[in-house]
């Protein structure tokens, strides 16, 4: 799905990692590279949601893509709002990317797992929600189902934990046979 992220992760690799075994929901796919992990899922409307982390970094990156989103200018920053199950929206500054991959243009933003408002973190709300609404200037851009998100984020956390633990081995990329592994969760 977001192959360029996986290529970046593999290129920055120091060692290989095994994927954590997690129950399958059939909706989210987990991919691991030696320096990070990504989960992604596609909606029936063609929108793809990807979340990735690189071991040791303090935020998770989100990418929401749809082939129909042709009005976004590449590299342009957009103020958007993300809300979950009609809760108070989270303001985000997203950057548009046009030529990413076959899933189309998208908006990307980063969130610290500790980023909280009103007692609940963005990640906690994301994991617990049935849906995510994305708006800009009061207009709906997309609404995405988040079925299976708790399992996907648990798999992402386990994968990042394994990558972080393995990163201290000092092995070179060539020695490790750096590869990308995938699993549907």
Please report, for each region that a protein language model flagged, where it lies by residue.
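A generic "folded-domain core" signal
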Residues: 20-185
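N-terminal signal peptide c-region/cleavage motif recognized by signal peptidases
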Residues: 15-18
């Amino acid at each position: 799905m977001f192959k360029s992220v996986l290529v970046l992760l593999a290129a920055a690799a120091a060692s290989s990692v095994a994927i954590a075994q997690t129950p399958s929901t059939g909706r989210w796919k987990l991919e691991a590279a030696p320096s990070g992990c990504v989960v992604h899922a596609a909606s029936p409307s063609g929108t793809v949601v990807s979340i990735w982390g690189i071991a040791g970094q303090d935020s998770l990156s989100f990418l929401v893509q749809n082939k129909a989103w042709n009005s976004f200018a590449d590299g342009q920053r957009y103020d958007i709002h993300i809300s979950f199950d009609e809760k108070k929206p989270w303001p985000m500054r997203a950057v548009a990317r046009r030529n990413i991959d076959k899933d189309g243009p998208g908006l990307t933003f980063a969130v610290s797992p500790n980023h909280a408002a009103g007692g609940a973190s963005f990640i906690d709300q994301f994991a617990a929600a049935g849906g995510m609404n994305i708006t800009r200037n009061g207009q709906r851009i997309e609404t995405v189902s988040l079925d299976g998100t708790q399992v996907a984020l648990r798999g992402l956390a386990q994968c990042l934990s394994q990558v972080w633990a393995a990163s201290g081995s000092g092995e070179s990329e060539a020695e490790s046979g750096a590869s990308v592994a995938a699993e549907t969760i």
